[in-house]
From Swiss-Prot:
It is found in: Secreted, Extracellular space, Apoplast. The lineage of its organism: Eukaryota, Viridiplantae, Streptophyta, Embryophyta, Tracheophyta. Belongs to the glycosyl hydrolase 29 family. GO terms for molecular function: alpha-L-fucosidase activity. The keyword DNA damage does not apply. Residues 1-20 form the signal peptide. It catalyses: an alpha-L-fucoside + H2O = L-fucose + an alcohol. It comes from Oryza sativa subsp. japonica (Rice). The keyword Membrane does not apply. This is Putative alpha-L-fucosidase 1.
Length: 517
């Protein structure tokens, strides 16, 4: 009996030590902080993670050298000689685009699938003897390449005779939408264009459309000027606002009637999660024209910085030509654009950095929310501070001096968008010098600036809707961009408004009560 009592006493005395060293699992883990509403749905989150989509404007306009087309265009003009939807899908997959979005019906009303509700479709064309189905071929090609399918169905239909009759046309439109969403498998995005020119007045029953789309495709996102799932950024240049919130009030705008600055910037007080989508064409027009040439790869890179790099999704239009292929010169630009991005973002100078932070949620030793989590490029692990702070700091020791001109920041947006104001500084000659100041971060924020060199960086967050959460911090070199390349070290005469260079100099090294992970 005495031996048993001694053993029990030893266990009781040793238990605190075992707990202190993590031998037992009895200590309760620290839960994640509460999300800050609104937050994305599953479909919205997957949409944002894909970063880019490839837009495909194709139809009779391709053959008639027009943009909005004509209701009088003979279906016989649609006669691609070498249409290869597989080429379109392969180009998208190779370029890092998460989905393809096809103009299944543009404003001219011509349908790229054999719709039973109109005689103005591929079924009336000579292509494949009237037995062709562009939507079907692209759906199969997208599945084969492991990318998603999106469909554009223009609300404005210049051909349909019942357009202008509220009940009849809404029934017609819902019928065509049902065909598209029940014949071709999963559809990840439905694109509703707000454009409308001349013609009859028409009241669209958008709520009924949205309900049907979500009913037929549970993981779809719907794009329009006003959502409900993703919004137009307000321009066709592919450029988002310097400040860009995903929170938004859908009731503030209507389809076809936007407030440009509100759409560009979003709303920190918005009640709805409606992230912005930036649309732009690789060519001057949306449809292919033999007389037009594509943008170059560095122009696309600049657009990438100002769209994906400002918390948006980039949808880049690359229109197939009249043969039914993406032109060789466009393919070359896409390849160069991809190679440039891979070169820039394949070497992160902060990948092996030592990271410290002013506080850590759950205590300095809590690995779950450790500062080092920001070195993993994933929104599902992140640094979180203790509650009750009003400003926050993270310090980065790169291990050795590096020259760089791009910084990437990310928030775990599944927890809501939080950061309102931040800055990044570099230690130069024992002085902290500000290299960038920013407002929002969101899913991804990319900053360009003239080349700097140093080993120690500091991220200071000066304002947030709630305790800030950071999921990634990266440091890169871009030697391709004309403005901020290694060959152009001098500060440009005109600095883009999204970059504020060397604003502040002081001797403060931040809070010394830091955690190192």
């Amino acid at each position: 009996m005495a031996t048993i009592l001694l053993l029990l006493l030893g266990l009781l005395v040793g238990l605190p030590l075992l707990r202190a060293h993590g031998v037992t699992g009895s200590a309760a883990p620290t839960p994640p902080p509460l999300p800050v509403l609104p937050v994305p749905s599953y479909a919205q989150l997957q949409w944002q993670l894909s970063e880019m989509a490839l837009f495909l404007h194709f139809g009779p306009n391709t053959f008639t050298d027009s943009e909005w087309g004509s209701v009088r265009a003979d279906p016989a003009v649609f006669a691609p000689s070498a249409l290869d939807a597989g080429q379109w899908a392969r180009a998208a997959a190779a370029g890092g685009f998460g989905r393809v979005v096809l103009t299944a019906k543009h404003h001219d009303g011509f349908c790229l699938w054999p719709s039973a509700l109109t005689n103005y479709s591929v079924a009336a064309s000579p292509w494949k003897g009237g037995a062709g189905d562009v939507v079907g071929e692209l759906a199969a090609a997208a599945r084969a390449e492991g990318i998603g399918l999106g469909l554009y169905l223009s609300p404005w239909d210049r051909h349909e005779p019942v357009y202008g009759d509220t009940v009849a046309y809404n029934e017609h439109y819902l019928g065509q939408m049902t065909e598209l969403l029940t014949r071709y498998g999963d559809v990840e995005e439905v694109w509703l264009d707000g454009a409308k020119g001349e013609g009859k007045d028409m009241d669209y029953m958008f709520d009924a459309w949205f309900a049907l789309i979500h009913q037929l495709q549970q993981r779809v996102v719907i794009f329009s000027d006003a959502g409900p799932d993703t919004r137009w950024v307000g321009d066709e240049a592919g450029v988002a606002g310097y400040t860009c919130w995903s929170p938004f009030n859908k009731s503030t705008v209507t389809i076809g009637h936007i407030i440009p600055e509100y759409s560009r910037c979003g709303d920190p007080f918005g009640q709805d999660w409606v992230p912005a989508e930036c649309d732009v064409s690789i060519r001057p027009g949306w449809f292919w024209h033999a007389s037009e040439k594509p943008k170059n790869a560095t122009t696309l890179l600049d657009i990438y910085y100002k769209s994906v790099g400002r918390n948006c999704l980039l949808i880049l239009n690359v229109p197939p030509n009249s043969s039914g292929l993406i032109s060789t010169e466009d393919m070359q630009v896409l390849q160069e654009f991809t190679e440039i991005r891979q070169t820039i973002f394949s070497q992160n100078f902060a990948a092996n950095a030592t990271v410290t932070a002013s506080t850590v949620r759950g205590g300095l030793g809590n690995q779950q929310f450790a500062p080092s989590n920001v070195l993993q490029e994933s929104i599902y692990s992140y640094w979180a501070p203790e509650e009750g702070q009003s400003s926050w700091e993270m310090l980065f020791d790169l291990g050795q001096s590096a020259s760089f001109n791009v910084i990437q920041l990310q928030e775990p947006i599944q927890m809501g968008q939080r950061v309102i104001k931040f800055r990044v500084e570099i230690l130069v000659d024992e002085l902290w010098q500000t290299i960038v100041e920013g407002t929002t971060i969101g899913y991804k924020r990319l900053f360009q600036f003239p080349v700097v060199e140093g080993q120690f960086l500091k991220l200071s967050i000066d304002g947030a809707r709630a305790d800030p959460l950071i999921s990634f911090f990266g440091v890169f070199t871009d030697s391709f961009s004309v403005t901020y390349s290694l060959e152009n070290h001098e500060k440009p005469s005109v600095v883009n408004s999204s970059e504020v260079i060397m604003l502040r100099t002081d001797h403060s090294f931040g809070n010394k009560s830091i955690a190192t992970m």
